[in-house]
């Protein structure tokens, strides 16, 4: 079935409290998607943001982002007052997330809500605290990660948010007696982090249930690696490559290439795949099972790393000293499917790939990705629409690309613009520089959007900012840039009925509309 969807981070939704959340704007966006005939809402990872405010460098592979908890819902529950919300600063620009301000204000308000909640639960049924039944159900269902996460975050707070490798040895090495004593002395702080995850889960499941009832699937995102400064790394031990002192032996990155003479040193700990194999890939089964409870479809980032990955000594200052190692290949995905059934995975397979990576993708039968901004460098490029395949997902650009408007005006080379203009029939087949310069940005953007929608690929995902025609101000992430990423927010009212009708009409031309919407249109003719 041909279908289409929109990439829109939760953080980019409008709202009064500094960042998008699971409030009314999320439900309104689902209504917008449904009206536009869309069947997929693609998100960035919903995990807590970490280094550089990136959702791909999180403190947990399982926890949800506290920033996304809807504060107005907590107010309706009597856990916050209007005065509590007005007392905090939420940033100066409603179109940009100010993460520094948000870090202070959000947690201050969430702690007030937690205090009110504990007060409500105090003394019930003869207990010091008797929490709601669904809270106990949540903590029981998620105890395999929640207990460690809450303890880890309480320890982070006690250690002034330092990386766990800088903690005192008994905490760093997880001395059972020391951790038990800390947990007993810090029950309220540990409870706070559980409370936030409980509210995150309840609110998100309400949004997801509403979306599914409207015929909208949620496409989530799973980074392949965990952050070095994460509860997963602190607890994981043998899951990762360790040296004799129990520290990470090697870390992840990319080799030197045309774009970077030193390569990219990401710093994420590498998995000890031999150990994972011994466990039957239990941790990965746990991780994917958890993700399937949050999302309907899963995009797996850096899919090539399951075939071959670049391993760099942890002491290196550049990626030059790394070498290629073999990943688990199909053995991992066979184990996942044996435990979880057919996997609704989309593989992020971008970049230069070894033949073995392409074979892994083919063997897995997962759809790969095609990105139009990569298509026009010359020759019979694999990203050109005529080279797409049915079992695939086409994008004008991903979150790492700039917007189509900015790409056409500033990012594309002269050769790329000339190639694209000819390919998209915006100019003669061999255009002059003057003919290319005469192509209007709006015309180029529309042609690129239609090229994506017209692709043979079963799915087309268009970033929201490209439907809106926004420029560089909406560029979500520039790889390698420190600060200023992940900040774009949409204006209130961006999801208008007029735009929904326009999107529905464009998608209907290429038979990508929600079947119910398309059937109604056909009956009306």
Task: Identify the function of each model-found stretch.
Residues 1-37:
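Mature N-terminal, pre-catalytic/accessory segment of carbohydrate-active enzymes
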Residues 44, 217-219, 223, 297, ...:
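Outer-envelope exported proteins of Gram-negative bacteria
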Residues 34, 204-212, 337, 361-362:
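Surface-exposed amphipathic alpha-helices with a cationic face
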Residues 9, 18, 53-197, 201, ...:
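Alpha-amylase-like alpha-glycosidases and glucanotransferases acting on alpha-linked glucans and related
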Residues 193-226:
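Conserved, well-ordered alpha-helix/loop/beta-strand core segments that scaffold catalytic motifs
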Residues 24-49, 294-295, 452:
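Catalytic domains of carbohydrate-active enzymes, especially glycoside hydrolases
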Residues 469-524:
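Structured C-terminal cap/extension of enzyme domains
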């Amino acid at each position: 079935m041909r279908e289409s969807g929109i990439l829109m981070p939760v953080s980019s939704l409008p709202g009064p409290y500094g960042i998008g959340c699971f409030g009314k704007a999320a439900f309104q966006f689902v209504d917008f998607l449904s009206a536009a005939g869309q069947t997929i809402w693609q998100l960035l990872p919903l995990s807590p943001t970490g280094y550089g405010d990136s959702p791909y460098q999180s403190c947990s592979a399982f926890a949800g982002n506290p920033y996304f908890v809807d504060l107005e819902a907590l107010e309706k529950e009597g856990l916050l007052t209007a005065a509590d919300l007005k007392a905090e600063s939420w940033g100066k620009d409603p179109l940009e997330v100010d993460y520094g301000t948000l870090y202070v204000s959000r947690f201050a308000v969430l702690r007030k809500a937690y205090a009110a909640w504990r007060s409500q639960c105090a003394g019930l049924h003869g207990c010091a605290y008797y929490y709601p039944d669904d809270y106990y159900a949540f903590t029981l269902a998620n105890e395999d990660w929640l207990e460690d996460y809450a303890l880890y975050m309480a320890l982070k707070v006690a250690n002034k948010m330092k990386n766990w490798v800088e903690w005192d040895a008994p905490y760093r090495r997880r001395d059972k007696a020391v951790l038990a004593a800390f947990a007993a002395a810090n029950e309220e702080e540990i409870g706070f982090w559980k409370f936030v995850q409980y509210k995150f889960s309840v609110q998100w499941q309400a949004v997801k249930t509403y979306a599914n009832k409207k015929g909208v699937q949620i496409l989530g995102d799973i980074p392949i690696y965990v952050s070095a400064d994460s509860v997963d790394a602190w607890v994981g031990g043998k899951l990762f490559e360790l040296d004799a002192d129990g520290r990470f032996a090697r870390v992840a990155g990319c080799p030197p290439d045309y774009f970077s003479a030193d390569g990219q040193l990401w710093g994420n700990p590498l998995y000890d795949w031999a150990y994972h194999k011994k466990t039957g890939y239990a941790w990965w089964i746990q991780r994917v099972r958890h993700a399937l409870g949050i999302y309907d479809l899963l995009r797996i980032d850096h899919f090539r790393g399951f075939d071959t990955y670049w391993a760099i000594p942890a002491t290196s200052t550049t990626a030059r000293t790394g070498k290629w190692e073999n990943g688990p290949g199909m053995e991992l995905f066979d184990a996942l499917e044996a435990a979880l059934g057919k996997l609704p995975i989309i593989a992020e397979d971008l970049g230069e790939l070894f033949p073995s990576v392409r074979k892994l993708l083919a063997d897995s039968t997962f759809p790969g990705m095609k990105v139009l901004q990569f298509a026009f460098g010359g020759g019979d490029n694999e990203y050109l629409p005529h080279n797409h395949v049915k079992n695939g997902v086409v994008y004008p650009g991903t979150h790492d690309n700039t917007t189509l408007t900015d790409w056409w005006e500033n990012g594309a080379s002269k050769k790329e613009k000339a190639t694209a203009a000819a390919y998209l029939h915006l100019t003669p087949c061999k255009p002059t520089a003057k003919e290319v310069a005469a192509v209007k940005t709006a015309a180029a953007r529309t042609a690129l959007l239609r090229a994506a929608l017209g692709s043979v690929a079963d799915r087309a995902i268009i970033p929201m900012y490209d439907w809106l025609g926004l420029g560089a101000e909406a560029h979500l992430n520039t790889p390698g840039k420190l600060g200023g990423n992940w900040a774009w927010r949409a204006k209130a009212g961006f999801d208008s009925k007029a735009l929904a009708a326009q999107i529905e009409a464009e998608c209907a031309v290429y038979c990508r509309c929600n079947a119910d919407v398309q059937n109604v249109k056909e009956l009306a003719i």
